[in-house]
Regions:
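Structural and coupling elements of P-loop NTPases
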Residues: 1-225
Length: 225
């Protein structure tokens, strides 16, 4: 919950990854419902699992409509096919429709497509997910089991496809040097420095631009239990 508050405070877009899909009792759709209710964030699965628990074999990409399998000793061989397993076909159709409905609640262009009762194209669906994610109005949810490298590549692809690049993010920093100088000048002039000191503590806001030749700016933080 603390991480969620910080992400909202700083307008950080998010993807969600439900790990350990090979564990007993794994239920990704219950987790997605908790994201919606407890975090109050519209969310929907981008995939449905093929098999469950020890029989977790792969994923159906409901955006590109492909079955994806990670094979090899470390799951590093990715095999895709257009043949969706019959046992998950109806679930995949249902979750794709759910994805479209969730997006139509937060994206105007997808809402128009939904009202027209038209099936969105791949490009329209990807664009809608990206717009809603970048705007911090939606979280696409990916599934997998990291230790077996299943679903990890799809998550990385999702980061590239749906999260903003540095040029799309408004990055700001606090320049305390200028504010402190103004506070010192006000103090020397015998003026009320209370307001200026308050500004000095938090610093004046400065817009940052990604540039290799610019000075380094970093954010240091500490996590505590």
């Amino acid at each position: 919950m603390t991480v969620d508050r910080q992400m909202r405070r700083y307008s950080v877009p998010r993807l969600s990854f439900i790990n350990k899909m090979d564990r007993a009792g794994a239920n990704p759709f219950r987790v997605i419902e908790q994201i919606r209710t407890k975090l109050r964030m519209p969310a929907a699965a981008m995939q449905v699992p093929i098999g469950a628990e020890d029989d977790f074999a792969g994923l159906v990409d409901i955006v590109r409509w492909k079955a994806v399998y990670n094979e090899g000793t470390k799951g590093n061989v990715v095999r895709e096919t257009d043949e969706i397993p019959a046992e998950v076909l109806e679930l995949a159709k249902q979750k794709r429709q759910e994805l479209i409905e969730q997006l139509s609640d937060v994206d105007d262009e997808m809402a128009e497509i939904f009202i027209e009762e038209r099936e969105p194209t791949l490009e329209e669906l990807v664009a809608a997910v990206r717009r809603a994610t970048v705007a911090c109005r939606f979280s696409p949810v990916f599934l997998g089991t990291a230790i077996k490298n299943k679903g990890v590549q799809a998550l990385l692809d999702g980061m590239c496809a749906y999260l903003p690049n540095p040029m799309e993010v408004r990055a700001v920093a606090n320049d305390t040097a200028v504010a402190k100088r103004l506070a010192a000048e006000a103090n020397e002039a015998g003026e009320d420095v209370t307001a200026v000191q308050s500004t000095a503590q938090r610093g004046s806001e400065v817009q940052l631009v990604p540039a290799t030749e610019a000075p380094l700016v970093g954010l240091a933080f500490k996590l505590e239990e």
